[in-house]
Amino acid sequence: MTEYKLVVVGARGVGKSALTIQLIQNHFVDEYDPTIEDSYRKQVVIDGETCLLDILDTAGQEEYSAMRDQYMRTGEGFLCVFAINNTKSFEDIHQYREQIKRVKDSDDVPMVLVGNKCDLAARTVESRQAQDLARSYGIPYIETSAKTRQGVEDAFYTLVREIRQHKLRKLNPPDESGPGCMSCKCVLS
């Protein structure tokens, strides 16, 4: 069974733990209890493949930022979460992404941008802004509500699909013989 190491990152209070617990335990936690670091495991079937999700729910508080490099090193894919009613959390996404790329020493790291709390009417980050940011990063964008469960499975499962595609790209790198060239080789005698 394939195991996927997923890491949930984002500013404090955006609902990282609520999303993770909603996926794992099917219930909404509405009291805010700041996380230092929690790990969860769940067996799921995604696109016909049984797999084990190893999910690391991380601290959003700045005082725990020193721990980030360590879990970023081991993570295969990252849910970058902001709250749609918190513009600052959206602006912080860039820093998380840059730190992930630096620690992984790669521009090609599986990520999904997640706009959480979409059940709330008091939106300060428009869908279009988030879609534009995700497009500029070349990653998917999914809106979720940990409260109603909307998009929760989709966010985590999309990240697993991104990891799978990343692994395939590493196994079969694109042919770099130039534009317009086919990958077949000719031998003239």
Swiss-Prot record:
Biological process, per Gene Ontology: signal transduction
Post-translational modification Cysteine methyl ester, affected residues: 186
Assigned keywords, A-Z: GTP-binding, Host cell membrane, Host membrane, Hydrolase, Lipoprotein, Membrane, Methylation, Nucleotide-binding, Oncogene, Palmitate, Prenylation
Propeptide: 187-189
EC number(s) on file: 3.6.5.2
Binding, GTP: 10-17, 57-61, 116-119
Catalysis performed (reactions): GTP + H2O = GDP + phosphate + H(+)
S-farnesyl cysteine lipid attachment residues: 186
Any single Pfam family the record assigns to this protein: Ras
Stored NCBIfam families: small_GTP (TIGR00231)
Similarity section: Belongs to the small GTPase superfamily. Ras family.
Name the record gives this protein: GTPase HRas
